Amino acid sequence: MTSTLPNASTPDPSSLQPAVRPGAHGRFGRFGGQYVPETLMPALAELEQAAAQAWNDPAFTDELNRLLKNYVGRATPLYEAERLTAHYRRADGGPRIWLKREDLNHTGAHKINNALGQALLALRMGKKRIIAETGAGQHGVATATVCARFGLECVIYMGAEDMRRQALNVFRMRLLGATVQPVTAGTATLKDATSEAIRDWVTNVETTHYILGSVAGPHPYPMLVRDFHAVIGEESKQQCQEAFGRLPDVLMACVGGGSNAMGLFHPFVQDMSVRLIGVEAAGDGVASGRHAATITEGRAGVLHGAMSLLLQDGDGQVMEAHSISAGLDYPGVGPEHSYLREIGRAEYAAVTDQQALDALRLVSELEGIIPALETAHAFAWLEQLCPTLADGTEVVINCSGRGDKDVNTVAEKLGDQL
């Protein structure tokens, strides 16, 4: 069901322009909102209030920044990918490619930025039990990590199929003390894990905080997760000035739910000279029907508490998504991405499983960096993008995670033996 929010603006740490704040009903244009049971409305209001107070409390922001530096390892480097740049260079020049190295964070991906921030909020709210959903396992690992750090009970919901694909991350979560709860319903992937996590939250809302892992879900989650990840773009903006003396021309990131992309894009949304490109999973090809290209192929609908673009059949039922990447295997997307697409501020493309595999291998061989399969989707779009870019174009790709977790999947698909 839908509920309205008080007509009060929420203090925002990123000094946003009004055009990119969610409105009084938690909406980005027509997207977003709160489509949840009444049971959850007090918890969402409590979370929104706690976040607003926390961002205005120097003790909270100082602690967050201290942990981001000393525990997570920020700031992450902006790395010039010289051999990848040379690979795409033409006779008349070509773009210069930079990688924002989120793969170098503690736990190996961007997910720790949000998990850490929300864990601090949970402590502030007196919640001692944490639940989360995970697809590729990186958000689950990040959540289990911060729960271990702060002594919080941790339950991770993960689709049984994703547990098979990401067995290494399942072991990591358990090693960190988390309970990993298999979800066998539906396709046994991220959508189903999210649904089960929400059911748990409804039942245990008084004692439990749900650390949602993407810029999806009911308000205030899309804004909250975005703001904890905005450090990616804020650092990138400063690092670009230091590296080449101006803003980049193109920002690019993979998009499943969309948190790593929104973290990179958000501080640049008002800089209209900067192109924002999100890359989705085309799976076996969009025409095959087996894909997760939500923005490029979806229609507006409601899933997991918010209105956004979704993969739907002719009757409006949410369709099964497919991707070789467990982290992109989701039939929805964060509402702010849907909004940025609708107003023309961001562009979205889709690449197939095979294109992502080819890109993963290329980046590994040229740069000595094995990216996650999710991240490889962004790299794959360089094949189409680079021939269209003028000489000297500065391109920043968010290297959102490392590919250790995907080695077995890649070996299986490429026919290699480890």
Swiss-Prot record:
One CC-aspect GO term: cytoplasm
Catalytic reactions of this protein: (1S,2R)-1-C-(indol-3-yl)glycerol 3-phosphate + L-serine = D-glyceraldehyde 3-phosphate + L-tryptophan + H2O
Region (Disordered): 1-23
Cofactor dependency: pyridoxal 5'-phosphate
The protein's enzyme class: lyase
Keyword Metal-binding listed: no
Modified residues (N6-(pyridoxal phosphate)lysine): K111
PROSITE patterns xrefs: TRP_SYNTHASE_BETA
Pfam family, one: PALP
Alphabetical keyword list: Amino-acid biosynthesis, Aromatic amino acid biosynthesis, Lyase, Pyridoxal phosphate, Tryptophan biosynthesis
GO molecular function annotations of the record: tryptophan synthase activity
Protein's pathway: Amino-acid biosynthesis; L-tryptophan biosynthesis; L-tryptophan from chorismate: step 5/5
InterPro entries: Trp_synth_b_CS, Trp_synth_beta, Trp_synth_beta/beta-like, TrpB-like_PALP, TrpB-like_PALP_sf
EC annotation from Swiss-Prot or TrEMBL: 4.2.1.20
Biased composition regions of type Polar residues, renumbered to the chain: 1-17
Subunit structure: Tetramer of two alpha and two beta chains.
Family matches, as NCBIfam families: trpB (TIGR00263)
Family recorded in the similarity comment: Belongs to the TrpB family.
HAMAP family with a match to the protein in the record: Trp_synth_beta (MF_00133)
Entry function: The beta subunit is responsible for the synthesis of L-tryptophan from indole and L-serine.
Name this polypeptide is given: Tryptophan synthase beta chain
Organism, scientific name: Synechococcus sp. (strain CC9605)
Gene: trpB
